[in-house]
Swiss-Prot record:
Name of the gene: Ywhaq
Transmembrane segments: none
Cellular compartment(s): Cytoplasm
Name of the featured protein: 14-3-3 protein theta
One cellular component term from this protein's GO annotations in UniProt: protein-containing complex
Length: 245
């Protein structure tokens, strides 16, 4: 299928909320090997975010049920098997995205904005893997996620305005990584607060195109800070799942 047709089909699939189809189309576009435009890049990101998002929330629900089920309950094995099925789907999706990033997207990125976008994505998908991993596998996955986020973070600080939505989105997700994966509320709050404060200080640099995106992410940073600081004051831990980009 021609690239233009694949893009049209991906947009149609998005409107129909058939994200698996959308992801298949955008994977095919990526595998043609040319650098993606901003629009194509966003279509790819939205497709896989929705595809993996369904599995992540399903995994959380099933894991929660599993933890609350009595060990003597005959249903426990069935629940465990089902969780592992969802886990396997989640791993497969993440592996596919990480392969696309390493083989095509990061290698072909010619500007800092794209590079940061794809490295953030790499950090995100290793983070999703870390959510379901254990033992040495989890340790390695966490290192991979942190490495990608850190590389993206260093480039974004050097090359982008503090109000840039990609830089803000990266700070948001990197802080969620610190809070949820590394269990380090202090670092998570420092990172989120610094990103928020730096953006506030330069609000006049916001361009009209990205005003809505930037202010939305700033609101999410602030929401997480509120949640995390109240949580560390001794509130219910389970509720403190941070909003992410």
């Amino acid at each position: 299928m021609e690239k233009t047709e694949l893009i049209q089909k991906a947009k149609l699939a998005e409107q129909a909320e058939r994200y698996d189809d959308m992801a298949t189309c955008m994977k095919a576009v990526t595998e043609q090997g040319a650098e993606l435009s901003n629009e194509e890049r966003n279509l790819l990101s939205v497709a896989y975010k929705n595809v993996v998002g369904g599995r992540r929330s399903a995994w959380r629900v099933i894991s929660s049920i599993e933890q609350k089920t009595d060990t003597s309950d005959k249903k426990l094995q069935l629940i465990k098997d089902y969780r592992e099925k969802v886990e396997s789907e989640l791993r497969s999706i993440c592996t596919t995205v990480l392969e696309l990033l390493d083989k095509y997207l990061i290698a072909n990125a010619t500007n800092p904005e794209s590079k940061v976008f794809y490295l953030k994505m790499k950090g995100d998908y290793f983070r999703y893997l870390a959510e379901v991993a254990c033992g040495d596998d989890r340790k390695q996955t966490i290192e991979n996620s942190q490495g990608a986020y850190q590389e993206a973070f260093d480039i974004s600080k050097k090359e982008m305005q503090p109000t840039h939505p990609i830089r803000l989105g990266l700070a948001l997700n990197f802080s969620v990584f610190y809070y949820e994966i590394l269990n380090n509320p202090e670092l998570a709050c420092t990172l989120a607060k610094t990103a928020f404060d730096e953006a506030i200080a330069e609000l006049d640099t916001l361009n009209e195109d990205s005003y809505k995106d930037s202010t939305l992410i700033m609101q999410l940073l602030r929401d997480n800070l509120t949640l995390w600081t109240s949580d560390s004051a001794g509130e219910e831990c389970d509720a403190a799942e941070g909003a992410e980009n």
